[in-house]
Amino acid sequence: IVTGDWSSDVCSSDLILEPIQGEGGDNHFRCEFMQELRTIADENDIMLIYDEVQTGIGVTGKMWAHQHFAAHACSDCCCGEDSSARPDIISFGKKTQVCGIAVGKRVEEVEKHVFEESSRLNSTWGGSLVDMVRLTIYLELIEKENLVERANETGSYLLNSIYALQEEYPNLVSNARGRGLYCAFDL
């Protein structure tokens, strides 16, 4: 990506990826990679979009997986304190039982963007009052039951258990990795 041609004659408007690739083999990106994407997006007037359909809503031990890549969360990596991997747009769904898009202020730089007016074109049945009430209740429960922190604590236990299996069976279990409850290993 860093050596790619990002000149103005290349028609790129967005960088879209999952902060942790689920269907792509459970690939956990390094902090530096995610922050470099933010730099590339900023330097080339490109929107950085995270697909948090599988990784969002607390499963990784943070409300959004991309929050693991913020400068304050990456103090153990080589990124500077002022670096960040913040997205311009987040897509989410599954755990909320509604599909959604969270949009940052950078979208306002785009003339006549689709978020200026309310629309239901992004989902056949989405956006109903029932959906909004259900989502509100889910978010209240997540906060009340402290589910994000509990996912972080339980995930730490799970990952440590996988590390123990990896140590006990090195020819069978390898590449233990995870954030919160979003853990994996190779067989």
Q: Across the structure, where does each feature detected by a protein language model lie?
A:
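Single conserved hydrophobic/aromatic residue that forms the stacking wall/gate
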Residues: 1-11
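Conserved PLP phosphate-binding loop immediately N-terminal to the Schiff-base lysine helix
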Residues: 18-31, 45-80
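Surface-exposed amphipathic alpha-helices with a cationic face
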Residues: 34-42
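Helix C-cap/helix->beta junction micro-motif
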Residues: 43-44, 169
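Active-site PLP attachment segment
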Residues: 70-114, 127-132
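Structural motif of enzymes handling amino- and sulfur-group chemistry
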Residues: 125-146, 150, 154
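Conserved PLP-dependent catalytic core of the aminotransferase class-I/II
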Residues: 145-187
